């Protein structure tokens, strides 16, 4: 700890980031890492034995292809086969009409690249077109490196083998031999979330970061999609299992902030918590067995009062409704998403994005051809790889690519100088490469925030030490050229994406926040009664809120990187946005607490009370996008009926009023603390 205290704050944050990424717990990560690791070693063995070129490309196919579960791996493998056919066909089309004419070759390749980049952003199968764009650009380097058309055709045909045999390999490893099923990962993930919930129910623990809670909720939703596609039993009882996922997400996120020491430590409360934990354990056992949980648990009037006293009644009701739900309830028909985005042909940003990518590639091609430096052709690949929809995400990808390339180049340099002279056979080579590939595979299976570092590190290492050589290599020039090519491509892309039609999310962020707050207002309009339809609707909208707040948080992180914006305006926007996100999360949890008390109120009173909050929040959200929102002020009517029934509800709603008052004033020139207390709120 003392050593960390002496380091600069940015370094400490970077180390904390990598510690979080490398230690991430995710069902299926270990099997995916092992599949990727074994696949890399087999690719090296096969390529070296049969002298198959482009080892780095084969490794890239593995890193992009092996996914977290067997169904997803099979789906990506099919896409890769289709992409290989399309990309080789496009290359032969280009070579046939323009092999000896670089200008004509670029004129033909340009529209192909633009079409692929356009479809990558607008089509559901964007990954296919991304692969075609990569090969279309990479193939332009073949005629420049070789003077014989026959050799170029032979290399292009080798690309079919290079793309398809790793695809076959990952299908055998990840789908047939050692499959990691989505249903197994879902059972493990649900039980892990319930374990965390029980820990917070029984012990006083520090709450986990809200971003982690939201990512876990999104991960469960993604697994649910794979389970629906891959498991027949899950599809048959999908309505119950989707309710189970929503219930577990609600219990996990609610108990994350639960502190048992905040309530009276009476014997009745202790026994009730133990009983609740016992029911959660029964749910865990049913999930492990893959069975729909059915419970005959009922809450007596005294237990209901105890649950209300310790703010656990709503959790009990969600468990009760799940345990009493018919497993054969027919699911709600899901709407089929369109293959193209709605504004694909009306939004000019998509075509501008394709033009910017082509412009960056042409600049790099002109540069490395003009200086006659073929070794830096990776600059063209970099322009395609780091091309992202907006400035912030492009900068993030550039940092990841540069970081991965730097680590890969350092490893390649050390490997060439210190290890290569001592190697005599393929077995020794595989033993030395094993820890490098294992490290790259573990990083590549982390979250999207850092996974590309592992992929780029292994690919750069292979480009410098294993590419097109089938024996010991001591050429340090390859390491230098590959790293410089990536740096040049990164610099060119940064300039193009910053100054040519920059797509800033600074205008989109307030709209995103307004959408999240609008969803929160919908939650407040749901009747706060323990009725099946209302409670299920509440749980599903609540999951949508997790996704909305997480998307806003990620967008804030990208806007921070948009250096083309005025620094003061950017800082003010980020500060206000983060305040809205933080207060929105607090308001959601505070509103949860009112459910434990509001159900005892008369139904005629409740909608009017909840409507005050929803109206105020909707009015505030409508002005966020136009920077015309003031902090909401709410006046609560303290009727004698409400005071007589449940005085604690007034305190809970007053707390919500206080959180409303802390929402930032978007009309002020700078953020200032709220000086006026919200009406109806107490200190």
From Swiss-Prot:
Main localisation, per the record?
membrane
**Pfam families associated with the record:** FUSC
The record's GO CC annotations read:
plasma membrane
Name its cellular compartments.
Answer: Cell inner membrane
Q: Name one GO biological process term.
A: response to antibiotic
Top-level taxon in the UniProt lineage: Bacteria
Membrane topology per the entry is: Multi-pass membrane protein
Keywords of the record: Antibiotic resistance, Cell inner membrane, Cell membrane, Membrane, Transmembrane, Transmembrane helix, Transport
Annotated membrane-spanning segments are 43-63, 75-95, 100-120, 125-145, 158-178, 402-422, 426-446, 457-477, 483-503
Q: Which GO MF terms does the UniProt record name?
A: transmembrane transporter activity
Query: Into which family does the record put it?
Result: Belongs to the MdtO family.
Q: What does this protein do?
A: Could be involved in resistance to puromycin, acriflavine and tetraphenylarsonium chloride.
Q: How does it associate, per the subunit comment? A: Could be part of a tripartite efflux system composed of MdtN, MdtO and MdtP.
Please give the name of this protein. Answer: Multidrug resistance protein MdtO
What species does this protein belong to? Escherichia coli O6:H1 (strain CFT073 / ATCC 700928 / UPEC)
Lineage of source species = Bacteria, Pseudomonadati, Pseudomonadota, Gammaproteobacteria, Enterobacterales
Name of the gene this protein is made from: mdtO
């Amino acid at each position: 700890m003392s050593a960390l205290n002496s380091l600069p704050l940015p370094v400490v944050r970077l180390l904390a980031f990598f510690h979080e990424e490398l230690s991430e717990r995710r069902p299926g990560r270990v099997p995916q890492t092992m599949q990727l690791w074994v696949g890399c070693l087999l690719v090296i063995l096969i390529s070296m034995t049969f002298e198959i070129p482009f080892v780095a490309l084969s490794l890239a196919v593995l890193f992009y292809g092996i996914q977290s579960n067997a169904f997803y791996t099979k789906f990506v493998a099919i896409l890769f086969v289709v992409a290989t056919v399309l990309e080789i066909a496009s290359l032969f089309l280009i070579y046939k009409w323009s092999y000896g004419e670089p200008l004509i070759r670029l004129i033909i390749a340009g529209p192909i690249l633009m079409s692929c980049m356009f479809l990558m952003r607008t089509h559901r199968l964007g990954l296919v077109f991304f692969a075609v764009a990569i090969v279309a650009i990479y193939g332009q380097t073949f005629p420049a490196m070789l003077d014989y058309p026959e050799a170029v055709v032979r290399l292009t045909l080798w690309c079919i083998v290079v793309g398809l045999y790793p695809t076959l390999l990952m299908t055998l490893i990840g789908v047939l031999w050692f499959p990691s099923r989505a249903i197994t990962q879902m059972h493990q993930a649900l039980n892990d979330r319930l374990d965390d919930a029980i820990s917070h129910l029984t012990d006083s623990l520090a709450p986990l970061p809200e971003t982690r809670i939201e990512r876990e909720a999104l991960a469960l939703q993604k697994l649910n999609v794979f389970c629906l596609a891959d498991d027949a039993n899950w599809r048959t009882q999908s309505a119950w299992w989707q309710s189970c996922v929503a219930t577990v997400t609600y219990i996990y996120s609610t108990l994350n902030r639960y502190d048992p020491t905040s309530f009276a430590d009476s014997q009745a409360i202790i026994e009730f918590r133990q009983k609740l934990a016992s029911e959660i354990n029964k749910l865990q056992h049913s999930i492990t067995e893959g069975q729909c949980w059915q419970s005959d648990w009922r809450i007596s009037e005294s237990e209901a009062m105890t649950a209300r006293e310790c703010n656990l009644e709503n959790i009990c009701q969600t468990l009760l409704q799940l345990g009493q739900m018919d497993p054969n309830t027919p699911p709600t028909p899901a709407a089929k998403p369109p293959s193209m985005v709605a504004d694909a042909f009306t939004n000019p940003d998509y075509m501008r994005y394709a033009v910017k990518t082509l412009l960056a590639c042409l600049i790099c091609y002109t540069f490395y051809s003009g200086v006659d430096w073929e070794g830096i052709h990776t600059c063209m690949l970099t322009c395609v790889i780091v091309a992202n929809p907006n400035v912030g995400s492009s900068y993030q990808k550039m940092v990841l690519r540069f970081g991965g390339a730097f680590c890969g180049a350092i490893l390649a340099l050390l490997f060439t100088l210190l290890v290569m002279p001592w190697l005599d056979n393929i077995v020794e080579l595989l033993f030395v490469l094993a820890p490098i590939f294992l490290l790259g595979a573990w990083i590549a299976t982390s979250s999207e925030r850092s996974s590309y570092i592992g992929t780029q590190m292994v690919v750069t290492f292979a480009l410098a030490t294993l590419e097109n050589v089938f024996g010991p290599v001591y050429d340090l020039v390859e390491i230098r050229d590959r790293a410089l090519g990536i740096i040049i491509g990164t610099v060119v892309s940064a300039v193009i994406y910053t100054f040519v039609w920059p797509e800033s999310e600074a205008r989109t962020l307030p709209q995103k926040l307004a959408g999240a707050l609008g969803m929160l207002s919908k939650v407040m309009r749901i009747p706060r009664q323990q009725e099946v339809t209302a409670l299920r609707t509440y749980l599903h909208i609540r999951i949508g809120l997790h996704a909305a707040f997480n998307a806003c948080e990620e967008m804030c992180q990208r806007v921070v990187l948009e250096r083309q914006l005025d620094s003061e305006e950017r800082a003010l926007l980020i500060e206000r946005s983060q305040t809205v996100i933080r207060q929105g999360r607090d308001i959601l949890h505070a509103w949860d607490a009112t459910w434990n008390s509001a159900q005892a109120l008369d139904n005629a009173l409740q909608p009017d009370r909840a409507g005050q909050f929803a109206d105020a929040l909707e009015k505030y959200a409508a002005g966020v996008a136009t920077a015309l929102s003031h902090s909401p002020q709410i006046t609560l009517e303290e009727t004698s009926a409400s005071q007589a029934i449940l005085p604690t509800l007034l305190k809970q709603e007053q707390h919500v009023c206080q959180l409303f008052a802390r929402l930032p004033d978007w009309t002020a020139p700078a953020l200032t603390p709220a000086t006026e207390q919200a009406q109806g709120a107490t200190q």
